[in-house]
A protein has these predicted regions:
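A cross-family phosphate/adenosyl-ligand binding-site feature
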Residues: 1-121, 126-403
């Protein structure tokens, strides 16, 4: 995902410095070229050899180190950087950067990078230090200059206090870096609505009717759209996975709740991808108390739910692109093509429950992308890769429509 990308990690003097070893390892596993820059104080918390072993690159500390092939090192490395993350960012280094002080390898490199690539800072310090008006003023100044400040978590701190100032987890920092550099931002400025997961229709306070959807495919589409620069709203039912970061999440338990949420979200959407498995039927009446077991059969009277995709197709706005999904057990292409026409879709993603590697629950999928004029069957791919191919197709359709 990060092959060919150069990530600079700036580590300052904080007990949270040890966490960056895990982050460096995560980035290397995604094939990023990682270089760590440390302040002298940071070396009191973690040894440079740790980072050199994990990244395969020399850890840079001294601006005047003579043991390298000659170049103006802080400028040379800044030219290669795709993103810089200063984490943990101490109050001292935050103050230096905010006020133009560049007196060591880390701060001079950040100064050289700030005008040419994203620079992120993750403050980590005692609560009283973080809330000090001077620190807050420096952070606000950095935001005005275009730096991104990753807000600290609240929790138990190394000093024994409880409050704000805890550096976010390695996964959170990793997600921030991915957001900046993992993909080309071809969806920047676009609003994308994605539905995911399964709805649940109550029978009584204990039981409900649902399906096998886990939300993995819809979440993959939402995640990839976010990484490609879109503002994403994810309307989700029950899911076996967590929603991706940096998306607006709207929870919807029933088909009726999802319909209302989708109607509201789709009003100003450029792209709508309806990947949720929504119940076609619901109990006509919901029992107020738990239904007791009894001899003999139980009959439930069901009624149709609103067809959300058909409503979206009937109310599609000019310039809006609508993508649906079709899970079938027979006559895949015929049934999917019929759904495409009936519901006024621009694209439908068809997959068969009978195909190995496709369907619910897994991390892979095998789909066919159908439009009015063509059908393209994709090979077995991860759901992230499938999501990218779906978004690629949507972008192609939008470009063709604008000609």
């Amino acid at each position: 995902m990060l092959k060919g990308k150069t990530v600079l990690l700036g580590v300052t003097g904080s007990i949270a410095a040890y966490k960056i070893a895990g982050l460096a390892s995560m980035l290397v596993k995604q094939h990023a070229d990682v270089t760590v820059l440390m302040t002298q104080n940071a070396t009191n918390f973690i040894h440079p050899t740790t980072f050199e072993t994990l990244t395969g690159n020399k850890c840079l500390i001294d601006t005047f180190d003579r043991n390298f092939q000659f170049s103006v090192e802080h400028v040379a490395i800044a030219k290669r950087a795709d993103v810089v993350l200063v984490a943990p960012a101490s109050a001292n280094v935050i103050g230096k950067i905010a006020n133009g002080i560049a007196d060591d390898m880390l701060t001079t490199t950040v100064m050289a990078c700030a005008c040419r690539c994203p620079v992120l800072l993750a403050p980590a310090m005692n609560t009283n230090m973080f809330e000090n008006p001077i620190v807050q003023d420096n952070l606000q100044k950095l935001r005005r200059f275009g730096y991104t400040v990753i807000e600290p978590d609240s929790g138990y701190l190394a000093c024994g206090d409880t409050g704000r100032g805890k550096m976010p987890s390695e996964q959170v920092l990793f997600d921030w870096i991915l957001r900046e550099i993992a993909c080309e931002k071809d969806l920047a400025g676009k609003r994308v609505v994605v539905t995911a997961g399964a709805t649940a229709e109550k029978i009584d306070p204990v039981r409900f009717i649902t399906n096998h959807s886990t939300g993995r495919m819809g979440c993959a589409v939402a995640r990839r759209a976010m990484l490609r620069g879109a503002a994403v709203t994810l309307v989700c039912g029950r899911m076996a996975v967590e929603p991706p970061p940096f998306v607006e999440v709207v929870r919807a338990e029933s088909a009726a709740e999802m319909f209302e949420a989708v109607k509201a979200a789709a009003q100003d959407a450029d792209i709508v991808v309806k990947a949720a498995a929504v119940a076609d039927y619901r109990p006509k009446t919901v029992a107020a108390e738990k239904m007791k077991k009894q001899d003999g059969a139980l009959t439930l009277e069901l009624e149709r739910t609103t067809d959300i995709l058909a409503w979206l197709g009937a109310h599609k706005k000019p310039g809006q692109t609508l993508c649906g999904f079709a899970m079938e057990t027979e006559n895949l292409l015929e049934n999917a093509a019929g759904k495409l026409r009936r519901k006024n879709l621009d694209l439908i993603v068809a997959n068969s429950l009978r195909t190995p590697g496709a369907g619910f629950g897994g991390d892979t999928n095998v789909v066919t992308l159908l439009t009015e004029t063509e059908a393209e069957t994709l090979p077995l791919l991860s759901k992230d890769e499938t999501a990218d191919r779906i978004l690629d197709k949507i972008q192609t359709l939008r470009k063709d429509e604008s000609k």
